[in-house]
């Protein structure tokens, strides 16, 4: 009888061990790879950077013409796809411009339609302050929004202004272009009703946007 109880206890312990092994626990201090979404195949982020003492703060933007510059706030062209292409190496692509962030021989950033492993892949390093540095293995320079004059001034110093980036989630979900245009045209084509509870016609304009559940 006693041996039977021992066998039952063994089976129970084995079952508990398998259950725990099959479901890894999530710890609150799991590490930066969890908080920064490094486990995701593609991260949608805005890359925020700022100069000394918080001056010249902006978001990296890849425009449709391939120009890479600063956006004062989050915009459609500052929304980026960050995708791992190798160990600790990523490719960065503009969601709306459909251009890859790439670096020229002089360290100038540009957006290219064709991905190049040499010019458009960057080593991703997370710093203790939470900011990321993206460095080109080929050119041995960090991604930076600094000007040509600044790059020359800081040459061989191991640091460039506007080269530390904070990955940020989009603050406002994007609306479909056709819906946003429709609402804006309706909103600004009608005169304001100053004595109305809805002077801008927001409620009226949104009545056309109905949940699929209402159609049941």
UniProtKB/Swiss-Prot annotation:
Gene name of the encoded protein: FGF19
Q: One of this protein's GO BP terms?
A: positive regulation of JNK cascade
Annotated organism of origin: Homo sapiens (Human)
SUPFAM superfamilies tied to this protein: Cytokine
The free-text function statement in the UniProt record for this protein reads: Involved in the suppression of bile acid biosynthesis through down-regulation of CYP7A1 expression, following positive regulation of the JNK and ERK1/2 cascades. Stimulates glucose uptake in adipocytes. Activity requires the presence of KLB and FGFR4.
Q: Which Pfam families match?
A: FGF
Instruction: State the protein's name.
Output: Fibroblast growth factor 19
**So what family is this one in?**
Belongs to the heparin-binding growth factors family.
Its tissue distribution reads: Expressed in fetal brain, cartilage, retina, and adult gall bladder.
């Amino acid at each position: 009888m006693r041996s039977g109880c021992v066998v039952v206890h063994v089976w129970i312990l084995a079952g508990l061990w398998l259950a725990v092994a099959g479901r890894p626990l999530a710890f609150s201090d799991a590490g930066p790879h969890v908080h920064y979404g490094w486990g995701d195949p593609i991260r949608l982020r805005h890359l925020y950077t700022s100069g000394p003492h918080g001056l010249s703060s902006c978001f990296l933007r890849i425009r449709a013409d391939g120009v890479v510059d600063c956006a004062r706030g989050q915009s459609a062209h500052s929304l980026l796809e960050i995708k791992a292409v190798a160990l600790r190496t990523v490719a960065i692509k503009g969601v709306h411009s459909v251009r890859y962030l790439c670096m020229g021989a002089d360290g100038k950033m540009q957006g290219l339609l064709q991905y190049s492993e040499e010019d458009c892949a960057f080593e991703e390093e997370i710093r203790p302050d939470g900011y990321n540095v993206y460095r080109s293995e080929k050119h041995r320079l960090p991604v930076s929004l600094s000007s040509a004059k600044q790059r020359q001034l800081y040459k061989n110093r191991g640091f460039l202004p506007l080269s530390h980036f904070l990955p940020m989630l989009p603050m406002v979900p994007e609306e479909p272009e056709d819906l946003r245009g429709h609402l804006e045209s309706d909103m600004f084509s009608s005169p304001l009703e100053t004595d109305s509870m809805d002077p801008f016609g927001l409620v009226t304009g949104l009545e056309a946007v109905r949940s699929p559940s209402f159609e049941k």
